[in-house]
Amino acid sequence: MKHYDVVAAVVCKDDRYLCVQRGRTKFEYTSFKWEFPGGKIEPGETPRQALARELMEEMDYPITVGDAVETVRHEYPNFSITMTAYLCTPQSDTFHLNEHVAYRWCEKEELAELDWAAADVGIVEKLCC
């Protein structure tokens, strides 16, 4: 089974968290699920560099990457990931969704209402407790 090391941005602004929704993917179990934005770490990158790059690629959104919030390991049916989430501060008030179909700014209490990708559930639980 293929394994990926990935990073996720827990972007917080005015006590709300940025959540993005995937479109249709090649796997039904990740299609239209909500997630924290991020992606794979490329060879030669630090996790923080990867996260800043991914948010620029996916959203044209400059961020400052802060401390790690949580690391989760998850096995999907076709691949597994180790994902580290970092608290991030936006450096702009605007962004553009290049890869996702929707976004929401959610207060902590609202996070549990979304249909999350399985790997992101541990991060949501960490933020809500």
Describe the residue ranges of each PLM region:
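NUDIX/MutT-family hydrolases
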Residues: 87, 95-127
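Conserved N-terminal beta-strand and adjoining loop/helix that marks the start
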Residues: 1-18, 40
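Conserved Nudix-box catalytic region and its N-terminal flanking loop in Nudix hydrolases
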Residues: 16-57
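Conserved S-adenosyl-L-methionine
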Residues: 67-71
